Amino acid sequence: MSFTYEYPRPALTVDCVVFGFDGGGLQVLLIRRALEPFLGSWALPGGFVDMDEDLDQAARRELEEETHLSRVFLEQLFTFGTPGRDPRGRV
């Protein structure tokens, strides 16, 4: 008996919000998007979750790939899932 079936499979993504202090003010780390969609726009570091990793691993990998930051305290704060958030498809 087969347990596979055709069903839409949304992509899973993570974004990281990194706070810092500069002088007396709170700062948020942003990157410039290197690819479409929104090439050159400011964005939070993040990306797609690989099939063999959990969300924490994906967040750490994406943060290091895009900012070269490692050994950073991470905590999941919110989850968003509104359809239409990304022009590439359902995330």
Where are these regions (language model features)?
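Short Pro/Gly-enriched beta-strand edge/turn motifs at strand-loop
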Residues: 1-2, 79
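N-terminal strand-loop-strand
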Residues: 2-43, 71
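Active-site segment of metal-dependent pyrophosphate-handling enzymes
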Residues: 10-14, 57-60, 64-91
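Short active-site-proximal "capping" loops at secondary-structure junctions
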Residues: 34-37, 49, 79-82
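Short histidine-centered catalytic/ligand-binding loop motif
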Residues: 44-52
